[in-house]
Amino acid sequence: MKALIFLAFLGAAVALPLDDDDDKIVGGYTCQKNSLPYQVSLNAGYHFCGGSLINSQWVVSAAHCYKSRIQVRLGEHNIDVVEGGEQFIDAAKIIRHPSYNANTFDNDIMLIKLNSPATLNSRVSTVSLPRSCGSSGTKCLVSGWGNTLSSGTNYPSLLQCLDAPVLSDSSCKSSYPGKITSNMFCLGFLEGGKDSCQGDSGGPVVCNGQLQGVVSWGYGCAQKGKPGVYTKVCNYVNWIQQTVAAN
């Protein structure tokens, strides 16, 4: 899901909730198998969003990815085949941020507690929460099983990766006048061609080994002047830690 008219990052839509599709990577490359052991697939009989494992029993995703029942699939690369080493664990608790706004996508973050702890190994491991916020120009890695086409649909079986920079607040806000809150940032390329897309929603943006972003929304995918918009995880570290401790 991408959101925002298709905003396509996570599947909802900020201005016009037009499409509840999830996002996928456009213009990226197939990730090295099991090289992103923190990446999870959220499954409801089908892949619908991504997420990030932050400890053995908790996953960070996007609030717009909420479903009442979710199975978290860890250790995945080809989501259409059981390759061996995957772990499928049902969600015990699904907690959206209390201030999430489905119209604006502000506070688009959600925590999922696994029914039982994941077994951590070379294929399934955690990503660190940010120690500080990312800065403009920082190179990051976005990943997911979302749509790979900016026009049309092609959902990949294999996890896709995209290397992309954090954009300045000014260029982000000028791309989406009046829609970027202090809890959002843009990442990608103003010239278009590379972006997250439907199906990538909820998935990770990792910069220097830290989870800085969650795929949230955008206007279409990989459109010129319309970069992807991401939830700024650094603003939620306290909420995440407090929620995990209380549940």
Swiss-Prot record:
GO terms for cellular component: extracellular space. It comes from the Eukaryota. PROSITE patterns: TRYPSIN_DOM, TRYPSIN_HIS, TRYPSIN_SER. Residues 1-15 form the signal peptide. Its cofactor is Ca(2+). The active site is at H64, D108, S201. The record marks D195 as: Required for specificity. The keyword Hydrolase applies. SUPFAM superfamilies: Trypsin-like serine proteases. Disulfide bonds join C31-C161, C49-C65, C133-C234, C140-C207, C172-C186, C197-C221. InterPro entries: Peptidase_S1_PA (IPR009003), Peptidase_S1_PA_chymotrypsin (IPR043504), Peptidase_S1A (IPR001314), Serine_Proteases_S1 (IPR050127), Trypsin_dom (IPR001254), TRYPSIN_HIS (IPR018114), TRYPSIN_SER (IPR033116). Binds 1 Ca(2+) ion per subunit. Residues 16-24 form a propeptide. Ca(2+) binds at E76, N78, V81, E86. Residues 25-245 form the Peptidase S1 domain. Belongs to the peptidase S1 family. This is Cationic trypsin-3. It comes from Rattus norvegicus.
